[in-house]
Amino acid sequence: MAKKLSRRLREALEKVEDRAYEPLEALTLLKETATAKFDETAEAHIRLGIDPKYTDQQLRTTVAFPKGTGQSVRVAVITSGEQVKVAEESGADLVGSEELIEDIQKGMMDFEVLIATPDMMPKVARLGRQLGPRGLMPSPKGGTVTTDVATAIAAFKAGKQEFRADRAGIVHVLFGKSSFAAEDLLVNLKALQETIDRNRPSGAKGRYWRSIYVSASMGPSIQVDINALRDLFIEEKA
């Protein structure tokens, strides 16, 4: 039996036409269709022409959003020695060595980002069962295996976000809040597009970008004209 749409969602769907919108027009519409009683998240869902079952067609990287994400991010750091104090002073929410690894093994997952120093990675590798399914296993490519924990903590707290293509070659990324100005959402979406283009897998063949949709977390999907987004030049303000 089909699920009955709420009146709120029906009214939002009526505003969206079956076509690809210019980027700023799409983001303005995203804001108009964010009608829930809370500040909805702005989401991007991007289908790429890759098959991640092949290692040379996998995409995993990070994006730094110039306008932030509007979210408070809890960062955990697994390290040892003097780096423990560095991580604590740099604003990490959870810091530890063996004891933090044990807590995670027992099911403690009270964080959105996990950073580890290289010396701890052999022990962190034991957490594959807990971290892998959630996409939280630290990796050098994701910027979460590093000796410079202070810089990494600051970057993720400021809105840096790790993402990857799923098994179907689709990227799902949160790039702001519906309360952001449409122009600020556009700056973030452009940063995401440029990051995906810069990190095109070497094995990707044919048309790389298949489609891109944006939406508020409780709103309808809105197709974006990908060529218009890629051709867009945003002048940096001094």
Curated annotation (Swiss-Prot):
It comes from the Bacteria. InterPro entries: Ribosom_uL1_bac-type, Ribosomal_uL1, Ribosomal_uL1-like, Ribosomal_uL1/biogenesis, Ribosomal_uL1_3-a/b-sand, Ribosomal_uL1_CS. GO terms for cellular component: large ribosomal subunit. Signal peptide: none annotated. The keyword ATP-binding does not apply. GO terms for molecular function: rRNA binding; structural constituent of ribosome; tRNA binding. It holds the Pfam family Ribosomal_L1. Keywords: Repressor, Ribonucleoprotein, Ribosomal protein, RNA-binding, rRNA-binding, Translation regulation, tRNA-binding. Transmembrane segments: none annotated. One of its GO terms (biological process) is translation. Coiled coil: none annotated. Belongs to the universal ribosomal protein uL1 family. Part of the 50S ribosomal subunit. Binds directly to 23S rRNA. The L1 stalk is quite mobile in the ribosome, and is involved in E site tRNA release. This is Large ribosomal subunit protein uL1. The gene is rplA.
